[in-house]
Amino acid sequence: MFTNRSLDTFSTGCRFTLAIGTIAFSPIAVGHGFGQRYDLPVPLLLWVIGAGLTVVVSFVMVGVFSGGCKTLGSYPRVNLLKASLMRGLAHWLPLAVIRTIAVILLIATVLAGFFGNQDPFYNLAPVMVWVVWWVGIAFVCALVGDLWALINPFRTLFVWAEWIIGRLMNGRQLSTVRPYPLALSMWPAVAGLLIFFWAELIWSAGSVPKNIAVAIVIYSVVTWSGMVVYGRDVWLQNADAFSIVFGILARFAPLELRLVNGKALIRTCTSPACRSKSLDCVNGYHCLTKAESEHREWNLRPPALGLVNDQQVTFSMMVLVIVLLATVTFDGLLETRLWTHILDRTLTSEIRWVGSVALVLFASAF
């Protein structure tokens, strides 16, 4: 008769063997943006039904296995800051160097967009925005941790501006720090995400370097204006589409930043990461930037456990996640024969309008 321990050992061995076999015998995978197009050897309808059932079954399993969990924050974790090497990496000097490099890359991207070769294949801006930033940062956030919150150059430039103004004007703050309206919730982020995906998927001139540079400047003005009115981290964690999306992806990651024994600070925080008010603050950078070093942890945790928490999900955040999922699916729809047939029956001058309406309708129906 098998014991629970022997069954666990057997199960672990099977999973390990399966993983090794998958790696050893899988064919070479080619990146989506650089490889040849691959058509599925199954009918599109069958693929769509299978994908839909996968989503439904996933939600059912999450509801079944996490519904009875009472200690959502009590998963195993290791504080990496207990190691001297990790404390050195988390020192202000390495962080300042990394953030400065990010600022330099941002400035170089904008200058290349305005003054460089306008051929997208010979300009830095399209590669930096669509490949290195949007795809690369997303993968790092999901597989490692919230890198964007660490290196965000727009936040860094605002911090520098705050420091300069404070020195020149006897400690005067750049932000007015007005209370963030509850009615706004995450709707600015939803609107920003829709505009971004429209530029990526529908706008035919979205790869033109000068247009990318103009878009970065417009985004900078909007972001810095929000920081001035409502505060730096309050705006980023409530209204900035990219900070929120990368933060959601970071919930899959094995690394987290945690504020412990700081409930007095958590009670006054307006960050979505702290709205539960009952557990330690995880990846709530509004709290972490104000906390003392002894209350901060840089933890290694099992992957994807950041998804399991008792944080109240607002309706606007639910819509944002749906828009994120819908637009990724819509990107695949643009490569199907159905969409090609629609474009064949559309006037050239109307293609952008047809695509825009289809994007909104698809996200609404999703």
Where are these regions (language model features)?
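Selective recognition of specific alpha-helical transmembrane segments in multi-pass small-molecule
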Residues: 220-227, 312-329, 361-366
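Hydrophobic, small-residue-rich membrane helices and short re-entrant helix-turn-helix hairpins
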Residues: 241, 295-311
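Hydrophobic alpha-helical scaffolding
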Residues: 147, 235-238, 311, 315, ...
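Secondary-structure capping and boundary motifs in well-ordered enzyme cores
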Residues: 128, 132, 186-191, 314-317, ...
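Long, well-ordered mid-to-C-terminal structural blocks that present hydrophobic/aromatic surfaces
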Residues: 333-366
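Transmembrane-helix bundle segments that line or gate the permeation/cavity pathway
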Residues: 18, 26-41, 45-295, 330
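Select transmembrane alpha-helical segments in multipass membrane proteins
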Residues: 132-138, 221, 319-321, 352-359
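N-terminal secretory/membrane targeting signals
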Residues: 1-31
